[in-house]
Amino acid sequence: GAEDDLLKRASLLRRDSVHGVFKGTIRVDEERQSFIANGNEVKVIYADAPEDIDYTQYGIQAGIVVDNTGVWRDKAGLSRHLAAKGVAKVILTAPGKGDIKNIVAGINEDAIEETDTVISAASCTTNAIVPVLKAADDEYGITTGHVETVHAYTNDQNLIDNYHKAERRGRSAPLNMVLTETGAAKAVAKVLPQLEGKLTGNAIRVPTPNVSMAILNLTLKQGTTREALNEFMREIALHSSMKKQIDYSDSPEVVSSDFVGSRAA
C-alpha cells in the first residue's frame, strides 16, 4: 500500500459522511501495519492474489473470509481464498452464481451445512424483501408479484457523466434518477424456491447516499384488507422469529434519512 494508506483508512473510519463521527478511539500502528479501534486491532494485509496470503502468520486458523470486492461471484473464483493458509470458509456479500447457497439471516440459515465452504449472504435488496415476502406467502400465498426498488446510488456509478459498461449508469449519480435492472427477483427464488418464476423486478437509482426502498406489488391467493395486512406485518415485526429483520412504522411523517443506521433488513 501507499505510504499514507493506513492513515487514510483510519480516517475513513473516524469520520463518515453519512453515519457521522466514530464513537471511540482510533490509533494507527504503522509498525504492526494495523490500526486499533476501541482496543480492537484491525490488521491490514496487502497481496496481489488471495491465495498468496498466509493468515496463520497473523494467528488466524480456520478463518472466515468475507469477500465484498465484487471481483468473483462464482465458486471457482471465491475458492481461491480457500487456497490461502488459515482459511476455512468464504462468505460473499452479493448474490452468488451457480450452485452457491444464498443465505438470508432469519430465513434459511438452516440450509448451511458443515461441508459448505463458500456461501453467499445475498444482496441488500434480497435481504430487505425476502422476510416480508416469506411472511406474506406463509400467511396469504403469493400468486405473482413485482419488486420496484428505489435504490441509493452506489460506488459503481459515476460522480459526473463518464463511460460505464451498463446502460445509463454512466450518467452522474448525484444529478439523476437512473433506471436500471435488478437481479432481486431471481435472487429471491434461491432463498424461497416456492416463489421461482412468480416475481419480476426493476430498479431506480436515486440521488441519495443511503437508505433504499423496495415497493412490493403482490397478487395474493387469499384476500385481505389493507388494515388486516398492516396489522399482520406489525405482529410479525414485534413477535415473530423475523423481528430482527422486519421493523414496522405507520407514521406518515418519516423520510429516508430517519432510517439511517437501522439494524432491520
Give short role names for the model-derived ranges.
Residues 1-55, 144, 149-265:
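C-terminal substrate-binding/catalytic lobe of Rossmann-fold NAD(P)-dependent oxidoreductases
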Residues 46-49, 69-70, 95, 123:
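Short glycine-/small-residue-rich Rossmann-like dinucleotide-binding loops
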Residues 57-59:
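A short, aliphatic-rich alpha-helical micro-motif
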Residues 61-63, 88:
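Conserved acidic residues
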Residues 69-117:
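Rossmann-fold NAD(P)-binding glycine/threonine-rich loop
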Residues 79, 134, 186-189:
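Active-site phosphate/pyrophosphate- and oxyanion-stabilizing loops and adjacent acidic/basic residues
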Residues 82-84, 135-138, 232-237:
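Short, solvent-exposed amphipathic alpha-helical segments in soluble enzyme
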Residues 96-171:
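Rossmann-like dinucleotide-binding core of oxidoreductases
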